[in-house]
Amino acid sequence: MRPAQDNQGSFLGRISIRRNQFVDVNNEQEQEDLELFQKHIADRFTELLSPPQPPPSDEINTVASVAATEQIMSVTWLRKLMDVFLCCEAEFKAILLMGRDPTQISKPPFDRLVPEMLDRSIKALDICTAVVNGIDSVRHYQRLAEIAVTALEQRPLGDGNVRRAKRALANLVVALSLEDKENVSGGGGGGGGGNKTTERSWSFGRRSGGSSAASKGGATIGQLKSSSWAVGRNWSAAKQIHAMTANLTPPRGNEAAGLPQPMFIMSTVMVFVMWVLTAAVPCQERSGLANHLPVPPKHLNWAQSLIGIHEKIGDEWKKKEKKGSAGLMEEMTRMEKLGHSLMEFADGFHYPAEKDAAESAAVQVAEMAEICRRMEEELVPLQQQIREVFHRIVRSRAEILEVLEQAGKVSAPVV
């Protein structure tokens, strides 16, 4: 899969000329950097908004149509979204930190904006943890679908094969329609596979810094050498996302032309990406997220495609919320439809199968098999990318805290 790097290489190459030099950043140069950053954001999300469309069904068979994997919310698309986030984050960090006097980001309004951004990053870590756990549930759905496919591919197709497929399909359909908390926390009804979100955690280490400077972003610098992250039983994705949007407002006046602007953009991108992930897979307590995610003003050019993606996903989420859904991942949505259709075939099956019904079912089984194949290839790499996002956020947060500590030492009075 081609990373969504765009012009990042040339941008970072040029900006790194100022690496390790504490100089006054030229205003004209900074404006050019900010404009490039906004352009790259717009370009990357435009590509995500308009993925290649599958060919008309009259030109290719159904299975080949399913192979067009880059639709919004497909596993392949979600992997591209992770690449986009990582590219945006790297470019933003270059703007924020490279060659900048550390005391600059400790002064107003950054003494407020930076801690708020660091606090959002902590909440994003929780969401990454929950989403990786949710993908484990999706892999369980995949296994149920594979059982049904294997049974229905047998020739000649007998009553025993159909009964085996029917049991797997029944569990699959129930799992895919469970409400969020049931699906992720409970693991009941054959849907969650005993997945215990409350027991999953990651640990990460930070270098110990000085003991004097403190961060309003959630931790004293150097206070903890390691932290453990786990999603509790009463944890709520909706509350987490809403908390991330607190105080997330576009900069005004002079701030709109300076560093607060990319800070707002990156925070918006982070919240949006976490919102998409919670929509895609089983995740605890998502009630209301389809309607209440704040989006940036439409007059901002960099935000147009992001808003377009938000609207597409939000509309689909509202439909699914009414009847209950484990997630909006494209493969899961298609799997649910095929599961219902194959259940109808199994309910009406009598040996020997009617020719037309058997042929129609065979096409659907082949499509289900293709979905399972894609999941087998893509779900684990998606989990790995989300872990990479997690650790990138951890590293960037530590680097920003380090810069704040340096600023504290520089500004401390000499005794």
UniProtKB/Swiss-Prot annotation:
<keyword id="KW-0217">Developmental protein</keyword>
<keyword id="KW-0812">Transmembrane</keyword>
<keyword id="KW-0472">Membrane</keyword>
<dbReference type="GO" id="GO:0016020">
    <property type="term" value="C:membrane"/>
</dbReference>
<protein>
    <recommendedName>
        <fullName>Protein ROH1A</fullName>
    </recommendedName>
</protein>
<comment type="function">
    <text>Required for seed coat mucilage deposition.</text>
</comment>
<dbReference type="Pfam" id="PF05633">
    <property type="entry name" value="ROH1-like"/>
</dbReference>
<keyword id="KW-0963">Cytoplasm</keyword>
<keyword id="KW-1133">Transmembrane helix</keyword>
<feature type="transmembrane region" description="Helical">
    <location>
        <begin position="263"/>
        <end position="283"/>
    </location>
</feature>
<comment type="similarity">
    <text>Belongs to the ROH1 family.</text>
</comment>
<feature type="compositionally biased region" description="Gly residues">
    <location>
        <begin position="185"/>
        <end position="195"/>
    </location>
</feature>
<dbReference type="GO" id="GO:0048354">
    <property type="term" value="P:mucilage biosynthetic process involved in seed coat development"/>
</dbReference>
<comment type="subunit">
    <text>Interacts with EXO70A1 and EXO70C1. Binds to EXO70C2.</text>
</comment>
<dbReference type="GO" id="GO:0005829">
    <property type="term" value="C:cytosol"/>
</dbReference>
<feature type="compositionally biased region" description="Low complexity">
    <location>
        <begin position="200"/>
        <end position="219"/>
    </location>
</feature>
<feature type="region of interest" description="Disordered">
    <location>
        <begin position="184"/>
        <end position="219"/>
    </location>
</feature>
<dbReference type="InterPro" id="IPR008511">
    <property type="entry name" value="ROH1-like"/>
</dbReference>
<dbReference type="GO" id="GO:0010214">
    <property type="term" value="P:seed coat development"/>
</dbReference>
